[in-house]
Amino acid sequence: MFLLLIILQALAVAIAQSQGDHKIIGGYRCVRNSQPWQVALQAGPGHRFLCGGVLLSDQWVITAAHCARPILHVALGKHNIRRWEATQQVVRVARQVPHPQYQPQAHDNDLMLLKLQKKVRLGRAVKTISVASSCASPGTPCRVSGWGTIASPIARYPTALQCVNVNIMSEQACHRAYPGIITSGMVCAGVPEGGKDSCQGDSGGPLVCGGQLQGLVSWGMERCAMPGYPGVYANLCNYHSWIQRTMQSN
């Protein structure tokens, strides 16, 4: 029985790892600029879309630690990811600060702060959001946004920013779905019947509950939105002090 549990846990870890540059299914097109804290991370000199992110101040963005790359830019004020837009701003990342206890294989402590090369201009299409200082209770309604695939397992990527409404799941439900893997640095969100989820390409994007940033898209099953397998997010309420301290000291 113990060996079987080890095998099942190892399989679950392998499934989580297989997502790579992870993770909207069952959602809808966001109203233009309704998520003004949403950031698109771009990698390399070619500015290839990589991940989502969230604007915390006029010079700091937060995203998933597994989105780290040697060269990063952030695009803000975006709706259509493939077109130039009058509201957009693109700024190079000057410094990447992953959480010091980030564990890539387990996706634990999967968060990273990005200091921008210059301050961004705040306005109607570009706004900051506060990190939640207290954890959300099970059943709390939340919204996730991103430019990740809208179909799974065969990927189909949108041009416009997508939103999906999900609920915070209980710790028990989260542990049942992923036994032996979930830590205090993670929180699950979804719907019991499945069909609504973040997915590949949404990584680092916001889980917003009650107007506060509660989580970042981190990992999940390779096939998204499956019943009984919610998405897993970095549980930012447990990192509030580290986030504030890091931004103030850098």
Swiss-Prot record:
GO biological process: epidermis morphogenesis; fertilization; negative regulation of G protein-coupled receptor signaling pathway; positive regulation of G protein-coupled receptor signaling pathway; proteolysis; seminal clot liquefaction
Record's keyword annotation contains Hydrolase: yes
Positions of the propeptide removed during maturation: 19-23
One protein family per Pfam: Trypsin
Domain Peptidase S1: 24-248
SS bond list: C51-C67, C142-C209, C174-C188, C199-C224
Role this protein plays: Serine-type endopeptidase with a dual trypsin-like and chymotrypsin-like substrate specificity. May activate/inactivate the proteinase-activated receptors F2R, F2RL1 and F2RL3 and other kallikreins including KLK1, KLK3, KLK5 and KLK11. May function in seminal clot liquefaction through direct cleavage of the semenogelin SEMG1 and SEMG2 and activation of KLK3. May function through desmoglein DSG1 cleavage in epidermal desquamation a process by which the most superficial corneocytes are shed from the skin surface.
Protein family: Belongs to the peptidase S1 family. Kallikrein subfamily.
UniProt protein name: Kallikrein-14
Organism of provenance: Mus musculus
